[in-house]
């Protein structure tokens, strides 16, 4: 069975990683008991706004699907600096849809208009770092108040279907969409600083909702495997087939 393990031991990090991986199917539809909204699809997102070197684009009503296939590659929880680092990949595709408004010149071709978009990323990866500080809650328990979040995405292989540039001329509209898909890798790469900042903001907001709902000690007990803390926080999580004994001291 699971025994207590020092939080500074390598087992602690393995337990956190295993727990988070097993929690992902639950997170897909949301876990209200810990303040976690559904992530597949991921909705209710702020607009993505990019304006640099004559390339203006705004993405509204963004919805992202495919995140329930996320694989957690590595997790590091530093309970001294209150820093959490997560590295993950999504085998297959994640797909973002919404409404784009663009005013740009790409490879000498002017593109201006507004309409629906679909962007798919094949085998993307993401690194997220959350940093905070313990804060007293209204019930006398200690909660983690996040002070910063950063994210870095490696978009894998992007493809795009974008409409709204020539809505009155279907052949031109089809040509513009085909062109957008061809240049999608370069365009997404140019958007990367904006996407990283946006993803960091989303991670901060979504993670803070959890850390404001579940006390710091319940999530990461000092001498209790992190997974046990998650079991306490999420009713019914103990039914998931998590082989914790493989990672704990006996």
From Swiss-Prot:
One Pfam match: JHBP
Highest taxon, organism lineage: Eukaryota
SMART domains named in the record: JHBP
Protein purpose: Has beta-carotene-binding activity. May be involved in the transport of carotenes from internal tissues to epidermis and cuticle of the locust.
Species in which this protein is naturally found: Schistocerca gregaria
One GO location term (cellular component): extracellular space
Protein name: Putative beta-carotene-binding protein
Tissue: Deposited in the epidermis and cuticle of male locusts during their sexual maturation.
Phylogenetic placement of the source organism: Eukaryota, Metazoa, Ecdysozoa, Arthropoda, Hexapoda
Alphabetic keyword roster: Transport
